[in-house]
Regions:
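Short Lys/Arg-enriched alpha/beta "domain-start" segment
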Residues: 2-155
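Short secondary-structure boundary segments
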Residues: 58-77, 159-180, 246-247, 298-301, ...
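Generic structural signal of hydrophobic/aromatic residues within well-ordered alpha-helices
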Residues: 66, 113, 117, 178, ...
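Short, intrinsically disordered, mixed-charge
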Residues: 115-123, 183, 187, 228
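Juxtamembrane/interface alpha-helical elements of multi-pass membrane proteins
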Residues: 142-210
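Membrane-associated alpha-helical segments
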Residues: 193-311
């Protein structure tokens, strides 16, 4: 059976979305103040890390259909992400490409929030998450900013910094989804090529091959759509320390290298399918040429026999 790239269901129309820039200055300031106050309380006299949990799903999220409580985040584009304060607990972020990031939210509450979100979006509740990842932020005013494996040390934190870290973590789990999909597709294409080599013939309809090439192109476009967020958030232009840390975070998660690897694998898959399609079309053309030659030969034979019949032979 020919492989298939799973297609994400993306019903969101960007033109219908709300840009963060559409929020009034008062709204942005109010939400930013609330987040900063929560961060101050959460980190006050704290000796442990701020825990972050990210997970991604097969479906895209229609941000305009999120349940009550979800809204734009001051330092991030509302076309891409919405956020929610979870009372007395923490903050959640939902990205349109199917990723969710929780900050200081316990497991039971995470499950409840995901169920509410998926129910509002009309998505199957039983579908499991595809990937999950944990990350931590430790605030220590006596230390300089640095990345330590799955932990970020910062001398201070605000809503802009939290948003930048959450965005990077969301991209990382989304990349894991595409890495798994592309790897599986590559294995299936190699199996198909091996079957063709052993059988010596291509028994695959051209329509199916064309469909798979289109699916691969769509998957490639989805990855590019996720990774366009690699552009540095505008708010970091005024935060030299976090700008440097943002670059370190991207390197720590290997986002650029993973993106290049996925693109290369997809291009390899598409090229392999094109070669098979061309070989199939070439073989079909050869068969058609043979059929035409045979038909011409038959027509000539009938013509000759007809002439013999006229002469009484």
């Amino acid at each position: 059976m020919l492989f298939m790239f799973p297609r994400k269901n993306n019903s969101q129309t960007l033109n219908e979305s709300v840009h963060t820039s559409d929020m009034s200055f008062h709204q942005r300031s109010k939400i930013a103040t609330e987040v900063n106050e929560w961060l101050h309380l959460a980190c006050q006299d704290r000796l442990s890390d701020l825990g972050m949990h990210a997970e991604t799903y097969k479906e895209d999220f229609d941000l305009d259909r999120l349940p009550t409580g979800w809204g734009p985040y001051p330092s991030l584009d509302a076309n891409d992400v919405r956020a929610k304060f979870i009372s007395d607990v923490g903050i959640a972020f939902a990205w349109r490409f199917g990723a969710i990031v929780f900050v200081e939210v316990p497991k039971e509450t995470r499950h409840r929030e995901v169920d509410l979100l998926r129910e509002s979006l009309g998505l199957p509740l039983r579908d499991p998450r595809v990937t999950a990842e944990k990350f931590f932020i430790f605030i220590d005013s006596a230390r300089s900013a640095q990345v330590e494996y799955n932990r970020l040390v910062l001398p201070s934190i605000n809503q802009e910094r939290l948003g930048a870290v959450a965005q990077t973590l969301a991209q990382s789990v989304a990349m894991e989804y595409y890495e798994a999909v592309v790897t599986q597709a590559k294995v299936q294409v190699l199996a198909m090529l091996d079957r063709i080599r052993r059988q010596g013939r291509i028994a695959i309809p051209a329509m199916r091959l064309n469909s798979q090439i289109a699916d691969a192109s769509m998957a490639q476009a989805e990855v590019v759509g996720v990774l366009h967020l690699l552009d540095k958030p505008d708010t970091l232009w005024n935060d030299a320390e976090m700008e440097s840390i943002y670059l370190d975070l991207r390197n720590a998660f290997d986002l650029e290298e993973r993106f290049k690897s996925i693109e290369y694998k997809i291009e390899t898959i598409k090229e392999s399918l094109r070669i098979v399609l061309e070989a199939r079309n070439s073989a079909l053309a050869q068969r058609l040429e043979i059929i035409i030659i045979v038909l011409v030969g038959v027509e000539v034979m009938f013509s000759i026999f007809g002439r013999f019949h006229l002469f009484g032979w």
